Amino acid sequence: MQYEFKDMLINGTEFNKGSSREVLQYAIGGMLYMPATRTKIVQDVIEQKNPDMKSICLDLEDSIGDDTVEEALILLKSTLSKLYTAMEEDKLSVDNLPLIFIRVRNPEQLRTLKNTLSQEQLGIITGFNFPKFDSSNTAEYIRAFNELQHKSLTKLYFNPILVDVNNYVEREMD
């Protein structure tokens, strides 16, 4: 069944991370980026501090310094584990969980996440944002994502963030 964006807006289509791709492509909406080092993410989600917040991105790239990457990875794992526990303890339902994306720095960091995140932690995530995405790194991002998807028990998605849209479109049109 195809959903049209207009119908979703008018009818207020319900969705969660398990919804179809046709729904999720529109449901992401305005994504709230926050550093993965932020310590109140779990509390804010459980308490529904921002009930209209439908998607968030835990940022491992621009919002954190190079010297805090390891700390951010540790906090990211903790955040995902706490959200999983909250769902197991019925403090949070999949319908109240925002769509959670992780913005990685590069394909290698995606592989690091594949090797360090548990299946439970991966189950909380909806997908990943790939920054500075262009023809020079497309294949590597896709390979790393496919490796991670193979480990996950749930469907994951990715959002490429294009470096230079005009240049990319012109190249693809030729």
Feature names for model-found ranges:
Residues Q2-G18, E22-D174:
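Conserved alpha/beta-domain cores
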